[in-house]
């Protein structure tokens, strides 16, 4: 490859971007977003999309036969449901024969690329890791400010893995020229398939480049830009130099003949789960009261995250407390700038554009706490920088190891053998060193948040949750996670905050709602907040179930309320930690608090918590819908009251936002479980972090796209997460839900195409009768309805 293409195709960049829509975005590990890896195919039926995923990425789309077998033998797949789903597809063989057929089909899988293509992948991955490094490498790749293609072109002659490139003149001068040089040897009708083939060859790196190029706030992209055209330019140049195949094979695989069988088993499993869920929902709708007229001691608003379901139950058991569910970014589209940082992080879902930069700024009357905080953290930071310089300095490294080896060895032994002691030591230090939230408050005017916007954010929150009454204390509770030596720690943070802690958002909404001018305007709009209601921000540590109250500005009149709540939260923590310990391998439920604290500090712990593993449903409705039910931490819960939303406007926002996000989360867990090698990231044991952006398996290769094996499996062969598509249950009229689906085609496609596995409406206008969505805006009575009661005809879709 020595010359530019003679044919200039001006639209090549846009053509590449269009084809790249089929590759899902991949976010950096420090801001991990649990997204659907097949999001580019959501416009297609699920079964077609997974077939495309297998063709492009080599990923399995359905659970293995042994997973189905275990679920069936454990009673999680109902025999009647399985029989119904098989008959619906005209499959007449018995379940055992079908399981054996699936097992046989699985042994035929062969995904190894040819040697030349493997060499291209290896060399390209090496240079992508070097170029995209975000501060991990002590010696960075030169010329990165010129762009990826130019930087690679400058070093390619010195790479012994790249034959036939002795001088920069041996390759085209531009990425576009490199792409066109290769493509011009093929008819234009084949260009898209060739582009698609090479973008899909390393979907992790491609997805990361795609995400980074789209992020206008990314400082690394601003400093060291990279585009998909540059990626393809380098790849196709390597393909040419290494004599690898350019075009994909034309003899497409016929696919898995057992696909219909797998779809039947999966649907039966999902139907069985839905029936079990509706038993709890139906009982609670008919038997629970909607309040007793007494004002609660406090109202706590949690993220809809499945981990909130457990702690909410235990808080409600402690006294007259109400808990509610709301999107964990609390409706504030923002980026957050932490104290002492000059970098902002996204704190809203990827589908929402940030509109504000909220900075933590110190208060003048807390100068003493700020000084103490800065003194301690300054010493720690200086020590870390000093040790890092010693370890990376070619001259000082060996004497440093000789002199400090015993001290490091002792520290390693302590962290390995006594993680609980390390956690207690850290907690003791934290108690004596002020945290930034003790002397900082969120600044709402960078760029300025208008008064109207503040009122809108507060009003939207209360309208979506259907609030008409307020306690003396209202606590907005974001969530975070605490783990040690865990590259995937951000996957345990708040998904609604783009893989970051939700505490800053909770503090912002609390500050907004405490604004007297905001309260006055809310009252004029019908949101009657009592004069004695105080709003507080808080943060739930999902690893230890500890809840931190940001109560520094609470007036003295409410100190007793806060003290009582804090005691109740400690009791709830003990109960929740004990319950969650039952699912943690080797943990003692009788020592739940110490067990969870130990796991948080244990740097050898591969499963500090289960995160959202087990998620299976999204329930939209009042707390009474699921009160007193143990949903086993498997349900996203969003508060909603149909009586305050006659036109369905609030429900529309919930279905457009949280429903879409929970579907993303659910499908990330689903696909990473059914094929962890392709859609997950494999075992943590063999992972290596690369460039502070992600992990690779072994010493190189593609950037892994999803969750690690240990986040999903109890062991290598036994999944903890049950791979089911999302079941959505909505407490509203069928007419309102139907109108929303009709109005918003992208939401309807998620349901019609099977990305949301089941949608059931519990209709309060029809005595809480349940109706299942069957596609095409049509409904039928749920099979779960009591056969002895009078059946309610499925309502026709409104015109």
UniProtKB/Swiss-Prot annotation:
Zn(2+) binds at residues 303, 305, 479, 494. GO terms for molecular function: zinc ion binding. InterPro entries: DabA. Belongs to the inorganic carbon transporter (TC 9.A.2) DabA family. It is found in: Cell membrane. HAMAP family: DabA. This is Probable inorganic carbon transporter subunit DabA. It comes from the Archaea. Forms a complex with DabB. It is a peripheral membrane protein. Pfam families: DabA. Part of an energy-coupled inorganic carbon pump. Keywords: Cell membrane, Membrane, Metal-binding, Transport, Zinc. Its cofactor is Zn(2+). One of its GO terms (cellular component) is plasma membrane. The gene is dabA. PANTHER family: INORGANIC CARBON TRANSPORTER SUBUNIT DABA-RELATED (PTHR38344:SF1), UPF0753 PROTEIN AQ_863 (PTHR38344). Its main location: membrane.
């Amino acid at each position: 490859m020595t010359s530019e293409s003679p044919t200039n195709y001006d639209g090549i960049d846009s053509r590449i971007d269009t084809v790249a829509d089929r590759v899902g975005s991949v976010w950096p590990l420090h801001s991990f977003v649990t997204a659907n890896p097949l999001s580019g195919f959501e416009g297609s039926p699920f079964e077609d999309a997974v077939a495309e995923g297998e063709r492009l990425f080599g990923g399995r789309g359905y659970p293995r036969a042994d997973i189905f077998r275990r679920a069936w033998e454990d009673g999680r797949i109902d025999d009647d449901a399985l029989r119904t789903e098989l008959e619906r597809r005209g499959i007449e063989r018995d379940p055992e024969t079908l399981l054996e057929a699936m097992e046989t089909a699985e042994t035929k899988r062969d995904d190894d690329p040819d040697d030349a293509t493997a060499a291209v992948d290896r060399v390209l991955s090496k240079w992508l890791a070097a170029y995209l490094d975000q501060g991990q490498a002590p010696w960075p790749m030169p010329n990165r400010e010129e762009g990826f293609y130019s930087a690679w072109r400058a070093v390619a002659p010195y790479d012994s893995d790249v034959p036939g490139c002795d001088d920069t003149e041996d390759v085209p001068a531009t990425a576009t020229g490199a792409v066109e040089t290769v493509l011009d040897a093929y008819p234009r009708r084949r260009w898209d398939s060739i582009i698609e083939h090479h973008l899909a060859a390393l979907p992790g790196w491609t997805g990361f480049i795609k995400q980074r190029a789209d992020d206008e706030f990314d400082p690394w992209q601003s400093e060291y830009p990279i585009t998909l055209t540059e990626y393809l330019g380098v790849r196709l140049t390597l393909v040419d130099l290494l004599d690898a195949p350019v075009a994909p094979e034309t003899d497409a695989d016929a696919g898995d003949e057992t696909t219909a069988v797998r779809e039947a088993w999966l649907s039966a499993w999902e139907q069985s789960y839905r029936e079990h869920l509706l038993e709890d929902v139906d009982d609670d709708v008919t038997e629970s009261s909607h309040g007793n007229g007494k004002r609660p001691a406090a109202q706590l608003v949690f993220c809809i995250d499945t981990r909130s379901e457990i702690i909410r139950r235990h808080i409600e058991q402690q006294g007259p407390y109400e808990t509610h569910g709301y999107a964990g970014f609390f409706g504030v589209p923002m980026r957050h700038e932490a104290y002492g940082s000059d970098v902002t992080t996204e704190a809203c879902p990827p589908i929402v554009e940030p509109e504000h930069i909220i900075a933590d700024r110190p208060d003048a009357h807390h100068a003493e706490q700020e000084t103490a905080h800065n003194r301690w953290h300054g010493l720690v930071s200086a020590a870390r920088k000093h040790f890092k310089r010693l370890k990376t300095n070619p001259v000082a490294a060996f004497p440093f190891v000789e002199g400090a080896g015993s001290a490091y060895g002792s520290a390693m032994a302590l962290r390995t053998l006594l993680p609980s002691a390390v956690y207690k030591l850290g907690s003791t230090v934290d108690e004596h060193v002020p945290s930034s939230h003790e002397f900082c408050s969120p600044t709402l005017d960078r760029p300025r948040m208008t008064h109207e916007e503040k009122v809108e954010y507060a009003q939207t929150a209360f309208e979506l949750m259907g609030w008409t009454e307020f306690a003396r204390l209202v606590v907005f509770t974001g969530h975070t996670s605490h783990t040690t030596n865990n590259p995937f720690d951000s996957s345990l943070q708040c998904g609604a905050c783009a893989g970051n802690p939700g505490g800053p958002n909770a503090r912002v909404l609390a500050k907004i709602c405490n604004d007297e001018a905001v309260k006055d305007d809310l009252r004029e709009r019908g949101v009657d907040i009592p004069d004695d209601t105080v709003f507080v921000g808080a943060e739930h540590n999902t690893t230890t179930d500890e809840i931190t109250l940001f109560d520094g500005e609470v007036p003295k009149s409410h100190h007793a309320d806060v003290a009582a709540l804090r005691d109740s939260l400690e009791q709830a923590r003990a109960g929740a930690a004990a319950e969650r310990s039952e699912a943690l391998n080797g943990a003692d439920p009788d020592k739940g608090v110490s067990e969870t604290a130990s796991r948080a500090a244990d740097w050898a712990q591969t499963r500090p918590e289960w995160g959202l593993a087990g998620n299976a449903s999204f329930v939209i409705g009042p707390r009474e819908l699921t009160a007193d039910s143990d949903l086993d931490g498997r349900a996203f819960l969003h508060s909603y009251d149909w009586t305050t939303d006659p036109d369905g406007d609030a429900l529309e926002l919930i279905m457009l936002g949280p429903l879409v996000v929970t579907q993303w989360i659910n499908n990330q867990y689903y696909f990473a479980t059914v094929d962890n090698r392709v859609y997950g990231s494999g075992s943590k044991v063999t992972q290596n972090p690369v460039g502070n952006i992600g992990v690779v398996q072994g010493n190189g290769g593609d950037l892994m796209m999803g969750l690690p094996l240990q986040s999903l499996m109890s062991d290598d062969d036994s999944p903890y997460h049950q791979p089911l598509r999302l079941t959505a249950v909505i407490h509203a009229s069928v007419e309102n839900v139907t109108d929303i689906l009709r109005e918003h085609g992208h939401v309807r496609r998620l349901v019609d195409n099977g990305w949301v596995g089941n949608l059931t409406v519990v209709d309060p206008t029809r005595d809480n009768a349940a109706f299942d969505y069957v596609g095409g805006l049509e409904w039928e009575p749920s099979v779960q309805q009591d056969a002895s009661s009078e059946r309610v005809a499925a309502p026709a879709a409104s015109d």
